Amino acid sequence: MVRDTRNVDLEWGLELCKPEKVNKQNLFTNIIKPQKDKINIKTDKIKFFLDNLFTEFSKFHDSCYPDGRISTRSKLRWPLLIIWCILIVFAIDKNFEVKDFLSIWINESFINENRFYSEIWGPIAIYICLFVLLLLGLIYCSKIVVKAIPLISIVIAAVVVIIAVAMVKILYICHWLIYKILILAFGIKVKPLGDTLPTHNGETGSHSKATVGSDIEQIEFQNMPTPVKK
């Protein structure tokens, strides 16, 4: 008797999915942990790649420009940019195997024909395409940054003005609300402040403009030293 084995894997998988058959430790060890390890390996690989890339470029840049800056009028700025793009292309290929992956795809596309073309000129074309795309991307990004600088300054100034106006408006509204609450809710009448000067008793009181001079003279008379009798 021949057994139908087409649904064996499905039945076995359904059997393992039953609650009594699920082992959380095995699930973590066999499924979750390997995926987590793969993600960590890729993350570490990217960090290592970026560290090496910027280290090598810093060495190259310091050897060409000891002062630490690239002049916009320097004739070597474009060769430096081209060499920098080439370094990035080779670093990307070395760390992420772009050429090997695309070469496999090209070889599969040209099976039994143009084998020499796919093995020799395929990687060269890949490198050229990567280099051109990277160079165009850098040039385009630099143009966007240069054009965006005035716009960014205008936006920042507008935001600052809006924030200042909003703060003044909020303070005014808060003052108005407090004033209305004191008058309407508590019945407090706010009197306008007059000129207040200390009286001869040491207290403060409201004075009119006519009595201000006499009060000042009285205060000066009180502060005069008393004569000493011999």
Swiss-Prot record:
Its main location: membrane. Keywords: Membrane, Transmembrane, Transmembrane helix. Coiled coil: none annotated. The keyword Membrane applies. GO terms for cellular component: membrane. It holds the Pfam family DUF999. It is found in: Membrane. Belongs to the UPF0494 family. This is UPF0494 membrane protein PB2B2.14c. It comes from Schizosaccharomyces pombe (strain 972 / ATCC 24843) (Fission yeast).
